[in-house]
Amino acid sequence: MTPIAITPVAPVDIIYDLKHTERATESSPVTLLDVFSRAVSQYPDHELSFITSSAHDSTVHTKTFAEFNQHVHALAQAMRAWGKPTGSVIVVYLTEHEDNMAAVWASLLAGYVPCLQPALSAQQAHKEGHVGHIKNLFSSATWLTNESGAEQVQSISGLDIHLLSELKASAEAGVDFQAHQPNPDDEAILFLTSGSTGFSKAVVHTHRTILAACHAKGESYGLTSESKIMNWVGFDHVAGSLEMHIAPLLYGASQLHVHASAILSDPLRFLHLIEEKSIQLAFAPNFLLAKLTRDLEKRSDLFGKFDLSSIKRINSGGEAVVSSTAQAFARTLQNLAKDGDASFVISAGFGMTETCAGCIYDPINVLETPPSYEFLELGTPVAGCEMRIVNPEDGVTPRPDGESGELQVRGPMVFVRYYNNPEATSSSFVEGGWYRTGDVGIVEQGKMRLSGRIKDTVIVHGVSYGIPELETYLQTVEGVTHSFLAAAPYRAPGQETEGFVVFYSPTFDLDSEDAPAKLFATHRALRDVSVKLITLPPQQIIPIPINQMEKTTLGKLSRARLVNLLKQGELAKHIDRAEELVSIARGASFVAPSTETEKTLAGIYAGIFNLSVSDMSASENFFELGGTSIDVIRLKREGESAFDLPEIPTIQILKHPVISSLAKYVDSLISKDASQEEYDPIVPLQLTGNKTPIFMVHPGVGEVLIFVNLAKYFQNERPFYALRARGFEPGHPFFTTMDEMVSCYAAAVKRTQPHGPYAIAGYSYGGVVAFEVAKRLEAMGDEVKFTGLINIPPNIADRMHEIDWTGGMLNLSYFLGLVSKQDANDLAPSMRPLTRKEQLEIVWKLSPPERLVELQLTPEKLDHWVDIAGSLIECGKTYEPGSSVSVLDVFYAIPLRGSKEDWLNKQLKPWAGYSRAEPSYTDVPGQHYTLMDFDHVPGFQKIFRSRLEARGL
């Protein structure tokens, strides 16, 4: 068959052949500022809407195009006052879509070049290395960020840091402003690559490349001024900023931008927003399609309840889309839709930062046209883009139709160069302007599909992680022969998302008597390291004798060769042997579910974690399987439905995470023989590992669910216990004094761990309680090697006196995500004259219905919860820190009020007077109420664990 290169059908010249440099006409903008001004003048009342990252503010914030225009012009005028030369690079490091969007447009209007910075690493060395690299790359270092971002980079010298809050404060609306007039080939926006295989490169996109891409995307999507799109991809990603903002803006389409955490923590919200906002175009990567399907396909109570008639197309990218997943998702949508005959188009796509996001698409109705392959085809190029498959060895020899090879693309939407990196630019292109994507693909009958990657990365939920770095950490695991380990990206047949496989040679004989125990321990350690580094365990871990692990002449293991052996079945005997040994090791503790309740729970556990029911032992622990706080809610709901129970209290799931134990509790509910349990503050969230346990005291709301996601990072390292306040269960009285609470908690800690050394910490209000418990343990003659205080000062009495019932109720409501921060601050004066019932009714009406369902709240439960929080406030009103402990570790985040610097120096540094050794003060990402949320807990756990290790624990 003849080699081929695929070009789009009937490309429209005006879309990509923008060779003129004169100012734009109304019909053909040639710069991004032309796009912006035309959208504002033609569609001033169209809207940009936003939902923030805060779990405590679910409201939709909206600006019309005209209002947004005034806002960014004022910011641009204020930016001009910085006195930077035209063309200066501004590193934009912000969290929210609206802030990022405003910063980018203000930079362009002021004549600067914005560079969008993704979230920085929580590891100090990585962060400092990256920021230093960026500073050298741009030969300057102007950063526009928020208070949290400034704190993260303050240790790096030579940065010119500007706060967005200060920029907003200095901006004057209505001031005459002459916007910069760029040329089409000027640098427009810089995007940073993931840096998964080294330091990030800065991808240069000009006005011309971005406009070419956006015209082609809009034509492919069928965008018009009446379109409504929804995006939840971060603005620092090309899909979030170019594909889902600038392309729709080019056509005047209204937009809704939702922070990813609002969707990932509540996938059902994706459908609610489509219905409420009449969304026509949305984006959902494969892992979200799979998660939505798993969460919703069994929700028969929701079938026929959603009006999804508006949605015309759902784009999916970032990783290959499994055909069966796409079909199951479309079928689930069909079940949920009021119109049972509704059809849904899912468009898998291919794109990269270097191609302005998607440049190859295949929009199909997967139910009407069943896919032919395991993964959805990626289709054909957009207008102006070409693709071809070549021999990856020489990078130029075309491969015949149907034969795999290196995917290359070219066209006007492909990036111009890597900033200040001519070597990387040169190596990325071959003769004829073809860009080497690093992906392996196949083209058949004009349509492309991917079959792998040349680059050493693995994609987890759309984020690339470097394989070499992962291997470095895996090599340190006991039981692994040094330099005889390789990890490789892999997607098993039928697997929903991409994963990876670990190949290694064990240091022990697989035929020895103790091989089962050693292999089990090694594989568990490899899994734990992987989860902590990239949040994903290996799909398979394959031990191969060292004499069968061939190395190249350079002394390296070939990942490609090992993956090919796996695919060809050549490693089957090693896999079978490993499974046999692991089965022997597990057999000692495996207990088959025996009662009907145990069997039902085993099925629910298996469904949540996508495991085989036959593998579920009655001794399985929910949290050791990887259960999160969201999974707890799912277990609660499915359990209540399966057993026809009005309620399974969340705390009982936390206290009975093992199938057999939870089954006994459920049986007692079914027989209505659930006697009142004696109060025990200890909630075991994680029981594996041999290191010193950690005891974590509840915040001021009394509950401990917030610690579930943190606890899983300590699996097989150390037990993790939470302490929950008294008063949640009927018949349990509130604490009345701090001394009573501390005495109860100290006794519970001693019952759980009779002898030291101890490690205890507390979040917010719980910090002072943890401090007092540590003092009590030391008074008993025990050693406390770690006392962690998370964002709490030593002197809290004055603050406790400030909080009345209304203030406490609003604080709790904000913490639970029922009201916004602004509402919590603004409502108190008008609510205080009202009765408690009237105040609760106001909060209830403001609360998102899905959040109330998730928390299983009723007005009565909320009222009682306010009283519990109030009892803790009362205990703190007379609190005095008093004497000291041996050592303190203070963790600080952005405070509720004031600057982070003042918070540290004026409020937290006084802890030094209550520590016999110099305390440590450690900065953690996030704000007071968000530092352990979905986005921040991966970074927080690394920092927290490093302090435990620093204390010899």
Curated annotation (Swiss-Prot):
Q: Which UniProt keywords apply?
A: Phosphopantetheine, Phosphoprotein, Transferase
Sorted alphabetically, the Gene Ontology BP terms of this entry are: biosynthetic process
An annotated Gene Ontology molecular function:
transferase activity
User: What sort of enzyme, by top EC class, is this?
Assistant: transferase
User: Pfam families annotated for this entry?
Assistant: AMP-binding, PP-binding, Thioesterase
Q: List each copy of the Carrier domain by range.
A: 592-670
Where are the disulfide bridges? none
Sequence positions bearing O-(pantetheine 4'-phosphoryl)serine: 629
Q: How does activity depend on pH?
A: Optimum pH is 7.4.
Extract the coiled-coil ranges from the record. Answer: none
User: Which PROSITE patterns does the record match to this protein?
Assistant: AMP_BINDING, CARRIER
* Thiolation and peptide carrier (T) domain: region residues: 597-667
Which pathway does it take part in? Secondary metabolite biosynthesis
Q: Where is this region: Adenylation (A) domain?
A: 37-460
Main function: An L-tyrosine:2-oxoglutarate aminotransferase (probably invD) and atromentin synthetase invA5 catalyze consecutive steps to turn over L-tyrosine into atromentin, which represents the generic precursor molecule for the entire terphenylquinone and pulvinic acid family of pigments, which are widely distributed secondary metabolites in homobasidiomycetes. The first step catalyzed by the aminotransferase converts L-tyrosine in to 4-hydroxyphenylpyruvate (4-HPP).
Q: Which family does it belong to?
A: Belongs to the ATP-dependent AMP-binding enzyme family.
Q: What is this protein called?
A: Atromentin synthetase invA5
Q: Which organism is it from?
A: Paxillus involutus
